[in-house]
Amino acid sequence: MAKRVHLFDWHKEHAKKIEEFAGWEMPIWYSSIKEEHLAVRNAVGVFDVSHMGEILFKGKDALKFLQYTTTNDISKPPAISGTYTLVLNERGAIKDETLVFNMGNNEYLMICDADAFEKLYAWFTYLKKTIEQFTKLDLEIELKTYDIAMFAVQGPKARDLAMDLFGIDINEMWWFQGRWVELDGIKMLLSRSGYTGENGFEVYIEDLNPYHPDEEKRGKPEKALHVWERILEEGQKYGIKPAGLGARDTLRLEAGYTLYGNDTKELQLLSTDIDEVTPLQANLEFAIYWDKDFIGKDALLKQKEKGLGRKLVHFKMLEKSVPREGYKVYANGELIGEVTSGTLSPLLNIGIGIAFVKEEYAKPGVEIEIDIRGTRKKAITVTPPFYDPKKYGLFREE
């Protein structure tokens, strides 16, 4: 049976399409993908992303454990702030892209992908048990996914909405900075973060879930529902729209963000014999802190010496067509890779995508062809984002 988020009943009543995604029944759209997408680019939208995973690490050894099991340096940010970091396997391949918040008092909250949290929880539990064969750890690992409702408010008007709701200016916060806030007596974690390319914030509310796998923890999500409805109520004057996963995907792709399960994963069994994707191949080296030891480091150092072989690259179509995952990519008549993500940009009305190709073609300005249902259509590799960053996105000129 598919998993359900806290507010599934609300979405079932209001969404036009609900579909299973990563094992969860989720709203895909309420009005239309294009309308919700443009609302976020031009005003503000709110997403229920409670399907995202949360894992809590507690204890004096929590930091040391996470420093070894993730790639970035999570010791630097003060409480309450987050660090974008990767979890790798021993071969250096990406198990997931995560955000780890330093919650203070030796507690760290990891935000991970919907289709990866169970795997990660099992992985961390296994590593803890393995290490404890040699030395005792002061560490507890707790799965919190079903206990936390998570909403993402995104768009140029998100700043105004945060001021109205919480009395804070998110532009005075750095990216991934968090703080505790209250709304009508309901306490929650707020972070300046998002997955759309736009300014925005995300809130985390601990609440009962009527669909919790543990029957004893089931109940009405009164706090989460109240916050969700207050966001929609206060956002009306800014043109807010509830947005589904359809718009979330087109928005992240326009911004050039990778999606775990498509662009990054441990096993990617495509017809071009792509097995696994590493941070170096996915242009994610910025999330690696080389001055420490971590799982997968040796494999990455060897890959640096040997060469990447293949790499992710962004592209836009030069002919009218829409690229999709799995479509073959050619250059000079040679098969060079496959599309990992593709869509029609609602903002630009052109086909855009990400492909995993031979390393020598993974640079801007290379003419390629995408095989779309037996016809090769012209495209060109580009540097993301796909939109004009002076007009749209986090760094737009107001």
Swiss-Prot record:
It catalyses: N(6)-[(R)-S(8)-aminomethyldihydrolipoyl]-L-lysyl-[protein] + (6S)-5,6,7,8-tetrahydrofolate = N(6)-[(R)-dihydrolipoyl]-L-lysyl-[protein] + (6R)-5,10-methylene-5,6,7,8-tetrahydrofolate + NH4(+). The keyword Repeat does not apply. SUPFAM superfamilies: Aminomethyltransferase beta-barrel domain, Folate-binding domain. One of its GO terms (cellular component) is glycine cleavage complex. GO terms for biological process: glycine decarboxylation via glycine cleavage system. Its EC number is 2.1.2.10. Keywords: Aminotransferase, Transferase. Belongs to the GcvT family. PANTHER family: AMINOMETHYLTRANSFERASE, AMINOMETHYLTRANSFERASE, MITOCHONDRIAL. The glycine cleavage system catalyzes the degradation of glycine. The glycine cleavage system is composed of four proteins: P, T, L and H. This is Probable aminomethyltransferase. It comes from Pyrococcus furiosus (strain ATCC 43587 / DSM 3638 / JCM 8422 / Vc1).
